[in-house]
């Protein structure tokens, strides 16, 4: 099985790197400047799993051929249009598994690759790429979930699942990836919302009065929107999520907050804006989520 990974940052570099370490046939699609750096320094990951240093297999967009069974997309959502252009020569037999935030990317990918070839994917990880190009993994979260968005056979996903099971990260072949996509969206909206609104980790928020309550209320706003859109979360899962995101001393920051700290562009439209639009379609008021969105609009205006 030949696997192409677009994006060699905190998600693509981490999961693709551990797939390569375990023996999978992995190729990373990169830009020329990034290729020079990776050829010189290799792919480096700092992780509780154990640090990783690899010589990655690299390809430029003009060198691609339609030979890949799986294409993993892990760019920022706002870079998707360029990613689609970069993948033009790779279009063929392969299926696409995007690991992007929100849901807006699926419509674009369906149009370009065909809905039968676009799966659903969720990455649970707290990671970033630092100024030296090293991927830093911050917590125990290290899981890929993927599956078919329609009721079709998992003929290509089963072999990919087998490859993933050889690695050090966790993996699940989902029976309802559409629900899992919503779960991730609501999870990241709460974590990104809280950590950007207050500019710190979850643990720094919950140590103060009302910190835990506002994180829970933010998550429950998102959960209510999901329910109105036909996606209900199990009570036991909700309890687990709330316990995790309000754990005392948690060092977790959303990647959006790390982007803010770097004065970089963020995915607030895809994570907050689209979710608020779903709420408005259902005449649902979500004041905390709206405050998070406004916070990021002010940030965007200041640093654009």
Q: What name fits each language-model region?
A:
Residues 216-304:
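NAD(P)-dependent Rossmann-like dehydrogenase/reductase catalytic/cofactor-binding core
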Residues 1-51:
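NAD(P)+-binding Rossmann beta1-loop-alpha1 motif at the extreme N-terminus of oxidoreductases
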Residues 30, 49, 62, 100, ...:
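Residues at the C-termini of beta-strands that transition into short coil/loop
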Residues 22, 89-90, 112-117, 132-235:
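Internal alpha-helical scaffold of NAD(P)-dependent oxidoreductase catalytic cores
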Residues 17, 21, 85-89, 111, ...:
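Short, well-ordered alpha-helices that flank and scaffold nucleotide-derived cofactor binding pockets
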């Amino acid at each position: 099985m030949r696997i192409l990974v677009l994006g060699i940052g905190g998600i693509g570099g981490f999961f693709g790197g551990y797939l390569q370490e375990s023996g999978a046939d992995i190729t990373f699609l990169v830009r020329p400047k990034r290729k020079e750096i990776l050829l010189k320094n290799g792919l480096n990951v700092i992780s509780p799993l154990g640090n990783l240093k690899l010589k990655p297999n690299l390809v430029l967009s003009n060198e691609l051929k339609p030979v890949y069974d799986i294409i993993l997309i892990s760019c920022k959502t706002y870079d998707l249009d360029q990613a689609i252009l970069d993948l033009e020569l790779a279009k063929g037999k392969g299926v696409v598994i995007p690991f992007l935030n929100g849901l807006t990317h699926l419509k674009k990918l369906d149009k370009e690759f065909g809905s039968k070839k676009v799966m659903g994917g969720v990455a649970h990880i707290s990671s970033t790429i630092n100024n030296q190009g090293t991927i830093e993994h911050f917590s125990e979260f290290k899981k890929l979930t993927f599956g078919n968005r329609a009721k079709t056979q998992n003929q290509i996903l089963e072999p990919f699942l087998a490859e993933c099971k050889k690695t050090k990260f966790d993996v699940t072949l989902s029976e309802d990836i559409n629900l899992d996509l919503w779960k991730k969206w609501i999870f990241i909206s709460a974590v990104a919302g809280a950590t950007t609104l207050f500019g710190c980790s979850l643990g720094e928020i919950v140590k103060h009065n009302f910190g835990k309550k506002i994180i829970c209320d933010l998550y429950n706003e998102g959960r209510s929107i999901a329910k109105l859109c036909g996606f209900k979360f199990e009570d036991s899962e909700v309890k687990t999520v709330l316990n995790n995101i309000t754990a005392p001393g948690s060092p977790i920051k959303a990647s959006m907050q790390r982007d803010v700290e770097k004065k970089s562009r963020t995915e607030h439209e895809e994570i907050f804006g689209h979710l608020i639009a779903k709420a408005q379609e259902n005449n649902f008021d979500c004041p905390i989520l709206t405050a998070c969105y406004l916070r990021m609009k002010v940030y965007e205006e200041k640093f654009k």
